[in-house]
Amino acid sequence: MQDALFFISNNLVLSLIWLFFLILIFFLSTKNMFLKSKIINNFHAINLINQKKAIIVDTRSVELYDSGHIINAINIPFNNICRKTIKKLSLSRSVPIILIIDSLEYNKYIKKFTKYGLDKVYFLKNGMNSWNSENLPTTFKKNIFLK
């Protein structure tokens, strides 16, 4: 024990760098456990859609949505997410929701949904870029929800 304290006192900068990286590794490895949502890949999203009848909510702009979106995705831009919208969609706590977000600030989107009592909120990693890169099916149909 004295050797460890002796080493730390003689190599304070090295010890602080080591401690910083240890905390960083711990934070990054446990981050997903404390999120109220999960970051999922395309494979997991397809499983949720097919097996659990997940609802896909595309939070991108109307222009991006109209340029191509996942089949049966509902376009709800960030500013339109409210309790009234959630009720109109008839979303329940038991139905998984997959968010398509083209922003690095996905936490604010997820907080909006969890704020209204929806627990099973998922975030598609890399959004439509990932979906399109794997040549998964998309459509150009207009959004019927907001009409």
Swiss-Prot record:
The lineage of its organism: Bacteria, Pseudomonadati, Pseudomonadota, Gammaproteobacteria, Enterobacterales. InterPro entries: Rhodanese-like_dom (IPR001763), Rhodanese-like_dom_sf (IPR036873). Coiled coil: none annotated. Pfam families: Rhodanese. SUPFAM superfamilies: Rhodanese/Cell cycle control phosphatase. Residues 50-140 form the Rhodanese domain. Gene3D superfamilies: Rhodanese-like domain. This is Uncharacterized protein BUsg_049.
